[in-house]
Amino acid sequence: MFLAQEIIRKKRDGHALSDEEIRFFINGIRDNTISEGQIAALAMTIFFHDMTMPERVSLTMAMRDSGTVLDWKSLNLNGPIVDKHSTGGVGDVTSLMLGPMVAACGGYVPMISGRGLGHTGGTLDKLEAIPGFDIFPDDNRFREIIQDVGVAIIGQTSSLAPADKRFYATRDITATVDSIPLITGSILAKKLAEGLDALVMDVKVGSGAFMPTYELSEALAEAIVGVANGAGVRTTALLTDMNQVLASSAGNAVEVREAVQFLTGEYRNPRLFDVTMALCVEMLISGQLAKDDAEARAKLQAVLDNGKAAEVFGRMVAAQKGPSDFVENYDKYLPTAMLSKAVYADTEGFISAMDTRALGMAVVSMGGGRRQASDTIDYSVGFTDMARLGDSIDGQRPLAVIHAKDETSWQEAAKAVKAAIILDDKAPASTPSVYRRITE
């Protein structure tokens, strides 16, 4: 038997906590036998004293084990259970293509996703732009969809990592969110509860990233890879660029439209293609569905070219109560904004920088995201035809097409877009889509 205050004191004095002490504390968070003040105190001591790798692994596994851990063995699936997690960005619609692509290659992807947070778009919000799409199927239905289709994208239920929910709520109001061991534990507790064989992390870098600097993004990626592998799940991470909107669109319905066009081959943004393929390659190799990069890319290109990936996406939408002909008739089903028109720069030049975070917040301000949990989303608003870094901008080339609910909203968004995109008389040096691969 442990005392919460003694565990806090031990960490306060700079000592490492044992696995048993960490489990006692996390179970107390779940059971409400640990007070909010005690949670806040431990969070602050971890913020200042950090955690050793064994402590980080123990924290993550204790939070994972505070609720249901999915077990797929009874289904006798003939492929690996794999998933991807992104730290979030703007125009980051990779999940909608990646899940079906990997499933079409023989993987099983039980993706538990989130809503938009701050300036970043949420996969669940995007999917809810599809009429009827059910993000909360019951456990049996979730398992059936994984078995039959190979991929399902759902919301987090209260039974998965419940201790994390209470821990995070306290961190949010005590200035302890930005602690790498606590971020790592929070992300991985939910992902590892999916019962995965392998995981790939997409850690964003740049003006639209969760972490403010490249060095902190790198440190987070290394921590996640170390902890997840320590917890027994094969994990790699990619550091990917978020110095500009990843897709050609940002919003909800507009990104779903682009995802379908990507899968069918109607239109593929080159940077979005690079990042999506790179993440899928990691999933196939970690899941032992391909022996190397070349084999993985060939398999993935094949399922795009022969229509299997698009077919899997369509089957997933239908299985989750969306329209059965969604892929064929997406324009019929997706909402469109009342006003769609281009915004042009006031001067000419090359795009040298982009405040991606500000562009994400502009989508939120138009109604495409939530400022508080009770807000309703306007799924139709957002940006399309986004200009890229290095593009030559003049009176013919707009910065973006803005989809807004009315003229006032359009004007506010246009002002935000102009302020967020910097022009110069010289084109900037090109930056990679993927900066680094982390395996340990």
Swiss-Prot record:
Pathway: Pyrimidine metabolism; dTMP biosynthesis via salvage pathway; dTMP from thymine: step 1/2
Gene3D superfamilies in the record: Nucleoside phosphorylase/phosphoribosyltransferase catalytic domain (3.40.1030.10), Pyrimidine nucleoside phosphorylase-like, C-terminal domain (3.90.1170.30), Transferase, Pyrimidine Nucleoside Phosphorylase, Chain C (1.20.970.10)
InterPro entries cross-referenced by the UniProt entry: Glycosyl_Trfase_fam3, Glycosyl_Trfase_fam3_N_dom, Glycosyl_Trfase_fam3_N_dom_sf, Nuc_phospho_transferase, PYNP-like_C_sf, PYNP_C, Pyrmidine_PPas_bac/euk, Pyrmidine_PPase_CS
Disulfide bonds: none
Keywords: Glycosyltransferase, Transferase
GO molecular function (one): thymidine phosphorylase activity
EC category name: transferase
GO biological process: pyrimidine nucleobase metabolic process; thymidine metabolic process
Tagged with keyword Transferase: yes
Catalytic activity: thymidine + phosphate = 2-deoxy-alpha-D-ribose 1-phosphate + thymine
Known EC number: 2.4.2.4
Entry's family note: Belongs to the thymidine/pyrimidine-nucleoside phosphorylase family.
Known partners and oligomeric status: Homodimer.
HAMAP family assigned: Thymid_phosp
Role of this protein: The enzymes which catalyze the reversible phosphorolysis of pyrimidine nucleosides are involved in the degradation of these compounds and in their utilization as carbon and energy sources, or in the rescue of pyrimidine bases for nucleotide synthesis.
Protein name: Thymidine phosphorylase
Originating species: Salmonella agona (strain SL483)
